[in-house]
Design a protein with these regions (language model features):
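Cytoplasmic coupling helices
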Residues: 85-104, 142-146, 169-214, 221-223, ...
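Membrane-integrated ABC transporters
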Residues: 1-38, 58-65, 83, 87, ...
Length: 566
């Protein structure tokens, strides 16, 4: 996690609000006008009371004064509503924009940078951390601007009575609106960030436990995991309690400071009136105005505690947005579009360079491929076999350009894949891994991910080729059947056949299949192998398998051992 100052985090988040600057100006204008009404009501009432005893200078009648007070009171409510409506419109628009940016960043980082990462922490960032930014966009930006402008307004009003009164008021505003929140923030230290990190860890721990609930129950590990969950939960509660305690102390300090400073202003006004430096009317109005003007600055004072968690969340979001992908996408305008005339790995060497493989296994820089060369011609079926860990799956991922090679090159139609537009590369290839991911959606929508504009007939043809159409039709809702989270209502073989159907529907000229029949019985295997054999001449197929029966349909077979190809 990068270390950024709070000011830097705020500046970066503020930059995202530029497209909504007009709404922000409206919110600030309504906020300033609303606080002017809030302060003006007691000031005008005091002036009316003074005029009633012939100590004021109000030129209006009592009826007019009451009408003006009523208008100002109603206006205060309306203006506050509009201000908050604008602030939350800005906040929710920006939260949607930030989510879009985060998902875009995750897509760029996948899979090389996210392999083996804590999915629970990512979920926490995408959901809870992004939601916490609402505090900044709805309750921080405009209150700061409103407080600054109200300082100018009140300084001008009190300065018109006496400069010393204005100076004391400005010092009071600075103490309440700046000194108190800064002190609370410093007292909190890194507790806000620690609290967010603990929450993210707990999210990952719970997600892990739910996914592995069967193993936890089978091996009686529930007590130890529950103990760890309780321990970390207690740490999170303690951290949040500290933040709330700091916030409560800040609020108490703010309230006490306002009372002391307002009384000091009152005593000063009395002294100035006694010395003949201001009129009695001026002393009363200055006192009333000061007592009623701290609203905008109380909002700032409260940020000292509430903003800690928000800035920590913002820092975690920026970590994702600023992360550089290991494999940079090639835009359509800059990349080449060579079509498909074969693909080849030419003298390729590769290691995960101390990171993690796509399976989340630390590679510690171990060379996975060592001067490996493989060629696939259009319409050809190529088999790759070898022991587990020999680099077969890694080779497929390099052909997909999920990672870039260390030496040599991967060439699509004679063009280095690093020069091919990413969209063109994805259109040319379809990859089915051993574990097919299915979304918590219908079978139809899971398949249409590969080609959203596919017709029902094309969908059926792909499913028949994957030997899964009859199974789908046997379900109560057919293609509209929900598959459950991660496809957990289906067997491994059913998920695998749906993955194959999705690849067939994509209709790419190159199919990369990693153990496509590992979860299938002999009957379904034979049907799928026949479908794959029928692809010969229509599209190229790369098969990774341990099964001799699968390799039997290959036109050419490579053997891999310790990263070398023979």
């Amino acid at each position: 996690m990068a270390t950024r100052s709070n000011a830097r985090v705020m500046w970066r988040m503020l930059g995202l609000a530029k497209p909504l600057a007009g709404w922000m100006v409206l919110a600030v204008a309504c906020g300033v006008a609303g606080f002017c009404c809030a302060t003006g009501v007691p000031v005008l009432a005091a002036e009316a009371a003074l005029s009633a005893v012939e100590a004021g200078s109000l030129p209006w009648t009592l009826g007019t004064t009451v009408a003006v007070l009523a208008v100002m009171a109603v206006a205060r409510g309306v203006l506050h509503y509009v201000e908050q409506r604008c602030n939350h419109y800005i906040a929710f628009k920006l939260l949607a924009h930030v989510r879009d940016l985060v998902f875009g960043a995750l897509r760029r980082l996948t899979p090389a940078k996210l392999a083996g990462s804590d999915s629970g922490a990512l979920i926490s960032t995408v959901t809870a951390d992004v939601e916490l930014l609402e505090v900044f966009y709805a309750h921080t930006i405009s209150p700061i601007c409103i407080a600054v402008l109200m300082t100018v307004v009140m300084g001008a009003f009190l300065g018109g009575i006496h400069p010393v009164l204005a100076a004391v008021a400005l010092a009071s505003y600075a103490l309440v609106g700046i000194a108190v929140p800064v002190a609370v923030s410093r007292a909190s230290g890194g507790e806000g960030r620690r609290s967010r990190d603990l929450a993210a860890w707990l999210s990952g721990f719970v997600l892990d436990g739910l996914r592995g609930l069967g193993e936890v129950l089978q091996y009686g590990a529930g007590a130890s995991r529950l103990e760890e969950l309780d321990r970390r939960s207690a740490e999170l509660v303690a951290s949040q309690r500290k933040l709330r305690a700091r916030g409560a102390a800040g609020q108490a300090t703010t309230t006490g400071a306002i009372m002391v400073l307002s009384c000091a202003q009152m005593l000063l006004a009395v002294w100035l009136a006694g010395a003949g430096l201001v009129t009695a009317e001026g002393a009363v109005l200055a006192t009333v105005a000061t007592f009623s003007s701290f609203g905008p600055f109380v909002a700032l004072a409260n940020l000292g505690s509430t903003l800690q968690g928000t800035l920590a969340a913002g820092n975690r979001v920026l970590d994702i947005l600023d992360e550089e992908p290991l494999v940079a996408e090639v835009p359509d305008s800059e990349g080449r579009h060579p079509g498909f005339d074969g693909i080849a790995a030419e003298d390729v060497s590769f290691s995960y360079a101390g990171g993690s493989s796509a399976d989340g296994v630390s590679a510690s820089g171990e060379k996975i491929l060592d001067h490996a060369s493989v060629g696939v011609e259009p319409g050809q079926i190529v088999g790759i076999q070898g022991k587990s860990g020999s680099g077969k799956s890694t080779l497929c991922r390099l052909l997909m350009r999920f990672w870039d090679v260390d030496r040599g090159r991967v060439a699509l139609s004679g063009t280095d894949v690093r020069e091919v537009a990413t969209s063109a590369l994805r259109d040319a290839e379809a990859f089915v891994e051993q574990d097919t991911h299915l979304f918590h959606d219908s079978i139809r929508d899971n398949l249409l991910i590969a080609r959203p504009d596919a017709t029902g007939e094309e969908l059926e043809v792909a499913c028949r080729a994957a030997s899964v159409h009859d199974f789908i039709c046997s379900l109560p809702n057919g293609y509209d059947t929900m598959v459950g989270e991660l496809g957990d209502t289906l067997s491994g073989g059913e998920r695998q056949r749906l993955g194959l159907a999705r690849a067939f529907l994509h209709d790419a000229p190159l199919l990369l299949l990693d153990e496509p029949t590992s979860n299938l019985d002999s009957l379904n295997e034979a049907q799928i192998l026949k479908s794959l054999s029928d692809q010969r001449g229509h599209r190229a197929v790369v098969l990774i398998s341990h099964r001799p029966s699968t390799m039997a349909i290959a036109d050419k077979t490579y053997s891999m051992d310790q990263g070398r190809v023979s």
